[in-house]
């Protein structure tokens, strides 16, 4: 199936074309329509099959189409590691290249205070998409640095790995916000 056969936003499609992506992988073909319909889902596929695009593309399309608060965090994507959070953020920048009003911030530990200050600034400005490791996000939550009451999309990337790493209580706490 081709991406242009799906109901993706034109700005997202333009970014895909620039990146030379034309056809969906099976996980994308199955997940994208369901997310566009607003359905919850559990996507399971091997590494390298396009799972990140399977959830990012429809979320970015929906955010760019409007109907979500401009001054709010609308999507939280949880990642078990800093490296994966950075990869997701890079994918977000590529897929969202033509989106003028959709912003993101990657939040993860293991860096200096300057990075924390940048995270705090992005959170206070209301980044649309927050990509975070559980521990670092809990830190921001406990300090009251962000309002998560208007989140419409909640993604657990590599959920099995996060649970194996002992993040189940953190995830429950974040999901209840």
Regions found by a protein language model. Give the residues of each.
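Methionine-biased hydrophobic packing positions in alpha-helices, especially
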Residues: 59, 78, 162-165
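Conserved pre-motif I regulatory segment
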Residues: 1-44, 157
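The conserved Walker
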Residues: 45-49
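Proline-centered helix-kink/hinge sites
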Residues: 24-26, 33-34, 58, 80-82, ...
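SF2 helicase catalytic motif II
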Residues: 141-177
